[in-house]
Swiss-Prot record:
It comes from Dehalococcoides mccartyi (strain ATCC BAA-2266 / KCTC 15142 / 195). Belongs to the UPF0251 family. This is UPF0251 protein DET0218. HAMAP family: UPF0251. SUPFAM superfamilies: Sigma3 and sigma4 domains of RNA polymerase sigma factors.
């Protein structure tokens, strides 16, 4: 049985979720899909300039996982830009800031202050 998928933490949902080359009808374009977590990895590393270890900590993932996610995101963006493809940002398993994620239940012993269980 595979390990359960760990939710990634993001700070905001991208305001724009679709990019395409100008002047080409959408029906004629191939499309790359970038997950919301991949977009967050790009934002943290390339836009904010954080070190990978700090960016991974903010997303609640390991540094190797962050690096794989960043590589995948950069590949998809470069492929879309250089080959004239559309880019859709959607999907993924993530939590927005400190809101609960993935219907996962946290045992009361981990959320209650000491002496409150």
């Amino acid at each position: 049985m595979p390990r359960p998928y760990k939710c990634r933490r993001i700070s905001e949902i991208p305001k724009v979720a679709y990019y395409k080359p100008a002047g080409i009808p959408l029906s004629l374009l191939e499309e790359n899909q970038l997950s919301t977590e991949e977009a967050e990895a790009l934002r943290l590393k390339d836009l904010l300039g954080l070190e990978q270890a700090e960016a991974a900590r903010q997303m609640n993932i390991s540094r190797p996982t962050f690096q794989r996610m960043l590589y995948s995101a950069r590949y998809k963006v470069a492929d879309a830009l250089l080959k004239g493809k559309a880019l859709r940002i959607e999907g993924g398993v993530f939590e927005l800031d400190a809101r609960p994620c993935c219907q996962r239940q946290i045992p009361p012993s981990q959320t209650d202050p000491p002496g409150q269980t």
